[in-house]
Amino acid sequence: MAVRILVVDDDRAVRESLRRSLSFNGYSVELAQDGVEALDAITNNRPDALILDVMMPRLDGLEVCRQLRSTGDDLPILVLTARDSVSERVAGLDAGADDYLPKPFALEELLARMRALLRRTVSDDSGDSQKMTFSDLTLDPVTREVTRGGRQISLTRTEFSLLEMLIANPRRVLTRSRILEEVWGFDFPTSGNALEVYIGYLRRKTEAEGEPRLIHTVRGVGYVLRETPP
């Protein structure tokens, strides 16, 4: 049975382009032109994933994210943001989106992001696993709970996958390319700063109450989880 994706964008040309591309690649696609239509469609016939523009009339993409997450709905969400709008990306992730893609984008990259997001969704439900701990940071792969010093930390799927990879390899330097391959998939383009954005997000969330930094940059190589700078 085909994976069902709801595409939400007020630009008809964008909707139709995504419908053709996703359908050609084996997905079942439904369309909505604003947030109100999107929430109705999700209520009536819940899709497997959501591609959501941020700027829309009536109800924007950020509010759709917030409303879904406030009810505990963990529907995988990829938001489409303005090319140079860092604030939109930050707001989208804060609202609960799992990943973001700046416009204009290559369809190949959108397909790669969607495949990676759906892979992470499948891994969310797989098997039993032990809690992972480093310093005062704890991650539970089954319940998907993350705490630091007992403080609960809320992460999106992408942030969780990235932290899980780091905590599974404590004090080992992970190259940028290896992280991109494992978290986003082998077909993920290595250009752009998506990884840096998510590292920044993890740092902000894990250091929100002044805790010492655990995620360090190894310049020119990648990142490492350790108590002190390398």
Swiss-Prot record:
- As annotated, the DNA-binding region falls at 129-227
Cellular component terms, GO, for this chain's entry? cytosol; protein-DNA complex
Q: Which SMART domains match?
A: REC, Trans_reg_C
The cross-references to SUPFAM superfamilies, in alphabetical order and at most eight, read: CheY-like
Q: Where in the cell is it found?
A: Cytoplasm
Post-translational modifications: Phosphorylated and dephosphorylated by MprB.
Keyword check for NADP, yes or no. no
Q: Which PANTHER family match?
A: REGULATOR OF RPOS
Protein's UniProt name: Response regulator MprA
Per the UniProt entry, what species is this protein from, by scientific name?
Answer: Mycolicibacterium smegmatis (strain ATCC 700084 / mc(2)155) (Mycobacterium smegmatis)
Instruction: Give the organism's phylogenetic lineage.
Output: Bacteria, Bacillati, Actinomycetota, Actinomycetes, Mycobacteriales
The encoding gene = mprA
